Amino acid sequence: NIIVRSIKLDKTLYKDNKNFGEAAIYFAGLIMILDGLAGAVAANTVIKTAVAMSGLTAILTWFVWGLFIYVIGVKLFPDKETKVSFKKVLTAVGFAHAPGLLRFFAVTPDLMIPIIFLTQFWIFAGLIVSTKQVLNLKSNIKSFGIVFLAFLIIAFLSISFVMSKMNALPISNIS
């Protein structure tokens, strides 16, 4: 029910407190792990991917998304009605990743790119919906801004990390 409602971008999913009970954080974590595995299955149609690492990477991604959305939306730019715990934000981020489960259907190279592209935008839309609802924001634009800023920070940090591992950062050549 939570997965279907998340895929449908049902905003009432995030307003109903019974969806955020004790087990919700574990269910959100399971969605993230399955999302990571689905991504590995999709990518495995073209290149060999470490499936076990995909689950671990998904959990790390979950915490990073949750942390940035929490800090940006709750600590830096809250609305008057924004009073939410990190756990609830983290749970909502996990629920919003349910469209990623559709990546299990990317079983041929021809399907991989369109399905990954579609599900990534779908997840982004889910993050915007969930952020607006759990942070009690008045504006869709503000919700978009919080999610987009989190995305930009994550992208910058990811690119910097990869470039540092490749010794390709401009500052890595200064001696």
Label each PLM-derived region with a short phrase:
Residues 1-84:
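Selected alpha-helical membrane-embedding segments in polytopic membrane proteins
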Residues 39-46, 106-107, 162-165:
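Juxtamembrane "helix-exit" motif on the non-cytosolic side of transmembrane helices
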Residues 29, 40, 115-116, 157-158, ...:
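Alpha-helix boundary/capping detector
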Residues 70-158:
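Hydrophobic alpha-helical transmembrane segments and adjacent short intramembrane/lumenal linkers
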Residues 1, 17-19, 44, 136, ...:
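Detector for Asparagine
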